[in-house]
């Protein structure tokens, strides 16, 4: 299946009322389901809604996704992202470092969701994410 076809399927899955548009509420619900602060929906609409009608059409959604760098470039840059989160340079990301990174990125995720996410992705159960665990999450999320 082509990447664009996958994106279209995701769009339709988020579009709960099947009206062909993503509303703030639909985007916020989707974000909440994956553990991201629903307020990020406002930022997504602001950056994606080209005709300023307060909702995102399939065309606007696909155009925004087409502007993203190719997947290979994205994966190659994840090490830089990991290192920017790993403030103490330990080679591991603590829950505190992750929380600080998310807050400075405008994502205020509740502590319970953050702990649950960390528990799910901390495969060796040492309380921190190493780069391999981080990359495994990225690869699973951005297949």
From Swiss-Prot:
Coiled-coil segments on the chain, per record: none
Top-level taxon: Eukaryota
Keywords, ordered alphabetically: Calcium, Metal-binding, Repeat
InterPro entries recorded: Ca-bind_SignalingProt, EF-hand-dom_pair, EF_Hand_1_Ca_BS, EF_hand_dom
Residues binding Ca(2+) 1: 15, 17, 19, 26
Gene3D superfamilies documented for this protein: EF-hand
Keyword Calcium in record: yes
Free-text function comment from the UniProt entry: Calcium-binding protein.
A GO molecular-function descriptor: calcium ion binding
Binding site residues for Ca(2+) 3: 86, 88, 90, 92, 97
Domain EF-hand: 2-37, 41-71, 73-108, 109-143
Tissue expression remark: Found in eggs.
Native organism taxonomy: Eukaryota, Metazoa, Spiralia, Lophotrochozoa, Platyhelminthes
Residue sites binding Ca(2+) 4 per the record: 122, 124, 126, 128, 133
Species: Schistosoma mansoni
Name of the featured protein: 16 kDa calcium-binding protein
Span of the signal peptide: none
Protein residues bound to Ca(2+) 2: 49, 51, 53, 55, 60
């Amino acid at each position: 299946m082509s990447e664009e076809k996958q994106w279209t399927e995701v769009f339709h899955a988020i579009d709960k009322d099947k009206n062909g548009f993503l509303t703030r509420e639909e985007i916020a619900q989707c974000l909440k389901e994956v553990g991201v602060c629903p307020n990020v929906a406002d930022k997504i609409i602001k950056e994606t809604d080209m005709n300023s009608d307060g909702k995102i059409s399939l065309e606007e959604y696909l155009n925004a996704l087409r502007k993203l760098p190719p997947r290979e470039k994205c994966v190659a840059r994840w090490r830089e992202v990991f290192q920017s989160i790993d403030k103490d340079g330990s080679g591991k990301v603590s829950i505190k470092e992750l929380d600080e990174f998310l807050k400075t990125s405008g994502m205020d995720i509740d502590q319970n969701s953050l702990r649950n996410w960390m528990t799910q992705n901390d495969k060796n159960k040492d309380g921190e994410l190493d780069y391999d665990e981080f990359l495994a999450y990225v690869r699973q999320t951005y297949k």
